[in-house]
Amino acid sequence: MSTTTLGIIGTGMVGVGVARRAVDAGLAVVLSNSRGPATLADLVADLGERARAATPAEAAEAGDLVLASVPLAAHERLPRAELAGKTVIDPMNYAPKPEWRVPELDDDELTSSELVQRHLAQSRVVKALHSIGPKQLLNLFRPAGAPDRTAVPLSGDDPAAKSEVAEFLDILGFDTVDLGSLADSWLSGPNTPLYALPYTGQPPAGLTPMEFVAWVQQSPGVPASAARVRELAAATVRGPAGFQL
């Protein structure tokens, strides 16, 4: 196992969910956020002896693999120097807002992960853990070979980095489906058949956008096989970039 320590930059729902699963799977985690290590004391105590708090730069340096779970709008604050030479998992999704839009994403000139890779030019970015929610991540893991093991998509430009992330996800309890390059990562982005719903099932009818988000965050999850992920990817047609609730 090449990954023994996971660096995590960002401790929102995704970062914390992945940290919990990683610790339970036997990995060490180094957590960081924009507010400082002292603000993570309770979380670290809850996670136990395999977890510690640090600054983003320290987490980047410590991780054999690094999860950059910050809002996409904050991706340019990721520590480039400390992440140089590292494989970086990108679970970020584009959520355009009146105060923050990216024309290159709106026009499909780039995917959000290509934007991240442009900032982290000396790192190996792999898109993963962006289409399954933290609740489902903590409920759907299974041992290798289990008939109901769930698969998640990944994309990246570096084959070795994709293999590294696939190994990590296997440790967490998931199979993977390689969808291609970062330019292909839109196949599993927001508003595609591969985003969220394969892992939650169909929501109740008549939900408002906010009710839908709350429902997704609480759904215990349903397994999605590698064959199902491939089937959905093959049928995906590109639509508008970013969340369109």
What does each model-found stretch correspond to?
Residues 1-46:
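NAD(P)+-binding Rossmann beta1-loop-alpha1 motif at the extreme N-terminus of oxidoreductases
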Residues 3, 62, 85, 122-125:
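A glycine-biased structural micro-motif
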Residues 17, 21, 119, 168:
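Rossmann-fold NAD(P)-dependent oxidoreductase module
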Residues 48-100:
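Rossmann-like NAD(P)-binding element
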Residues 53, 124-128, 177-179:
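General beta-strand structural signal in soluble alpha/beta enzymes
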Residues 80-85, 120-121, 144-146:
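Short, conserved loop/helix-junction motifs that constitute active-site signature segments
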Residues 92-142:
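Rossmann-fold NAD(P)-binding glycine/threonine-rich loop
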Residues 147-245:
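Active-site-lining helix/loop region of Rossmann-like oxidoreductase modules
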